[in-house]
A protein has these predicted regions:
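Membrane-embedded alpha-helical bundles that constitute the cytochrome b-like, heme-associated redox core
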Residues: 1-252
């Protein structure tokens, strides 16, 4: 799984540094906040417009489960997003103790394997015990024993020349696996994530097509739009739900 480990971290690095992705991410954040606030205000407006319920009503006959419970489903999704951001996004961006990706290699003539930081460029490896951690001071009295490399965040510098020589990966893979495999909360985190994806599927199932209806799109493409919306509402949450299930129950 070493290759999967690195591929996951390569993907995470791309998603957090690519300018186009970052712009789309911020647009998405703003859109979600606007959608949440707008939905909340619309719910309040509807309650004020009709504080007393209809004397006779049969909602099940007029609408589906998702459309009748959009506010509840939306609230659950918002709670999930906040939880997800705290456990993964915030750690990736702001946690000073975020682990860096390492790999163990047994060198010729060495009885025990050594840990190496994995560089973002092909073939870049830095022996962990020869690198100063971010903020660490080298107290070695013998100049020959002093470490030649130091970390500043994820950037690797040559100590003597004070020149950046490369970068290493933040280990989001480890954070993710540890979270879903945690002996105490792993099963609850896994089931909670899957439940959130189930809720998201319901929300998207109704929301995708209702959004086009609200925009007045009603033509020969309407059946296709509805089909695409339903496929999207099922496939995307399903693929995301598979990740924690695989990590918790299959990954060794």
């Amino acid at each position: 799984m070493a290759n999967a480990h690195q591929k996951f971290n390569e993907y995470a690095l791309f998603m957090t540094t690519n300018p186009a992705v970052k712009i789309l991410s911020y647009v998405t954040y703003i859109s979600i906040l606007f959608h949440a606030v707008d939905g909340f205000l619309l719910t309040l407006q509807n309650k004020k417009a009709r504080p007393v319920a209809y004397a006779k009503s049969n909602p099940a006959a007029n609408s589906g489960f998702a459309s009748r419970n959009m506010a509840i489903l939306g609230t659950l999704i918002l709670v999930f997003i906040v939880t997800h951001m705290v456990n993964f996004w915030a750690k990736m961006h702001f946690d000073k103790k975020m682990p860096l990706m390492t790999t163990s290699v047994t060198l010729p003539g060495q009885p025990q394997p050594k840990d190496f930081y994995v560089g973002t460029q092909v073939g870049q490896y830095y022996m962990v015990d020869q690198v100063l951690a971010d903020g660490e001071k080298d107290d070695a009295a013998n100049p020959m024993m002093k470490k030649q490399m130091k970390l500043v965040g994820t950037d690797m510098y040559n100590v003597n020349a004070n020149v950046k020589v490369g970068s290493v990966y933040k280990d989001l893979y480890k954070i993710t696996v540890d979270f879903f495999k945690d002996p105490k909360i792993g099963i609850f985190a896994t089931l909670g994530y899957v439940l959130a994806m189930f809720v998201l599927a319901f929300h998207l199932w109704h929301g995708f097509q209702s959004a086009f209806q609200s925009l007045g799109v009603n033509n020969k493409f309407t059946p296709t739009i509805k089909l695409v919306g339903k496929v999207f509402a099922i496939v995307v949450p399903l693929l995301f739900a598979i990740i924690p299930l695989y990590i918790h129950f299959v990954l060794k």
